[in-house]
Amino acid sequence: MAHARMILVAAMAVVPAVALAHGDEDSPLHVDPRVDECSIRFDAGLTQGAYQRFAREFGSVSAFKPTSAPVNLGRGRFAIAVEQLNFSIEDHADRWNDTFVHPDSEHDLGSDQMFPKLRARVGITDALDLGAFYTRNPNANYGWIGLDANYGLLQQAKGAPVSLGVRGAWTKTLFVHDMKMNTGTAQVGVGRTLWNVLTPYVYGGADVVVAQETSERVDLKTETEVVPHVMTGAELRWWHVSIVAEVHVSDLTSYQVQIGALF
């Protein structure tokens, strides 16, 4: 009997918590039949706390990532690539529900997100590469553009035991009326090439996300968030082909796969 009472008490304690945890899932979607796809538009009920979390997650996960080992291309060489970015979100949480509008009440944003990217990189010197990327959701109102610079401090090809580099990047969110978002990234990466073709690597660093609200429906202060991250991956370079797989661990975990051509 005592065990039964303990189980009952535990169940009574858990049920409200479960109900609270699922409360966000019952949040109604904000609907505008004029949009073709889920688009960024702030609802009047968006709070400062939810906006802060959105800035951290959206800004960091969309930031320009290396998706390459810290191995420089070399002067005069260049690379073009197509990349797939995958990550998951809590799409019914306030920070995502109150920042998006939907074509109808059944058209969820979805927890699993995927975006293709176009990238290019050029070797300015043997130790300095400059790169850029671009993507957008063609049926929605957001996309991103980014620039980066990679400087090699140590190069395994020149006798060092590993390749060591520093990287800086800038990412701008495009086409959104309700906010201006810019993200700066600073990283240090190290990798070691095996068998002259495969380079496992790791990066550590942080994103600085600056999100300025510009909506007519809310009055929120600008958020400046420092979001640390680590990432690991491996790059296979053979002939004129580069294949990369990378995992980025931060407020949101993301996965990148890239295939490119080297010239």
Language model features: what each stretch is:
Residues 92-97, 133, 142-147, 175-181, ...:
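Outer-membrane beta-barrel translocator domains and adjoining extracellular loop/strand segments
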Residues 22-40, 220-231, 235-263:
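Predominantly the C-terminal beta-signal and adjacent terminal strand-loop region
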Residues 74-76, 111-118, 140-145, 180-184, ...:
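Residues that define the transmembrane beta-barrel architecture of outer-membrane proteins
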Residues 126-130, 156-159, 197-200, 238-244:
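Repeated loop/turn-to-beta-strand initiation elements of outer-membrane beta-barrel proteins
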Residues 159-214:
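Detector for outer-membrane/organellar transmembrane beta-barrel domains
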Residues 22-158:
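Transmembrane beta-barrel domains of Gram-negative outer membranes and organellar outer membranes
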Residues 68-69, 80, 118-124, 147-151, ...:
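Residues on the lipid-exposed face of transmembrane beta-strands in outer-membrane beta-barrel proteins
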Residues 84-88, 134-138, 153, 168-174, ...:
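Transmembrane beta-strands of outer-membrane beta-barrel pores
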